[in-house]
Design a protein with these regions (language model features):
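Short, compositionally biased leader-like segments
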Residues: 1-21
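Extended, compositionally biased low-complexity polar/Lys-Gly-rich tracts
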Residues: 4-7, 45, 138-141
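Structural motif corresponding to alpha-helix initiation and N-cap regions
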Residues: 7-10, 26-27, 73
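Short, solvent-exposed polar/charged micro-motifs at secondary-structure junctions
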Residues: 12-15, 36-37, 97-101
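Helix-loop element at the rim of GNAT/NAT acetyltransferase active sites that forms part
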Residues: 16-27, 133
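Conserved donor-binding loop and adjoining core beta-sheet/short helix segment
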Residues: 21, 28-86
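Acyl-donor-binding surface of acyltransferase catalytic domains
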Residues: 58-141
Length: 142
């Protein structure tokens, strides 16, 4: 079941996201901007008490992380119908699942966290340069 993140989920979220750079990017954004931010919303996919995926909506961008690649495509389809993202970023296998929903987007790959711009076009910086590198990032760009 997909639901919005609350402060009570903090330890579960930290434990789930701390292993890979994709998860750490989401965790750092949550820690930097909090859950009360008007430009950021975090959704959790919790099944039988176990966290299966995390979806961060930040300034018309979506970052996702699902360890076992169990991306909830129905949830993303609903989300995209409400808010068409500028970018969708995450681990390559996670983003590849989303690509069939966004057929007019261009796929890009890299070893670095993609740039995310705020509502006024300013670059959002929530990680150090060293933290931005690692993993095989995939980004769908409009």
């Amino acid at each position: 079941m997909i639901r919005e993140y609350t402060e009570q989920d903090k330890e579960m979220l930290k434990d789930y996201l701390d292993e890979e750079p994709y998860g750490r990017a989401i965790l750092t954004a949550v820690e930097e901007y909090g859950t009360d931010s008007p430009f950021q919303t975090v959704y959790l996919d919790v099944r039988d008490g176990k966290l299966e995926g995390v979806y961060l909506c930040i300034c018309r961008n979506i970052m996702l992380y699902c360890k076992e690649n169990k991306v909830d495509i129905d949830f993303l389809e609903q989300m995209i119908s409400v808010m068409v993202p500028d970018k969708v970023a995450g681990r390559k296998d996670n983003v590849n699942i989303v690509s069939w929903l966004l057929t007019d987007y261009q796929a890009e790959y890299g070893k670095r966290l993609p740039e995310v711009c705020g509502e006024n076009g300013e670059l959002l910086e929530w990680m150090t340069e060293e933290e931005k590198y690692g993993g095989e990032w995939s980004v769908l760009v409009k």
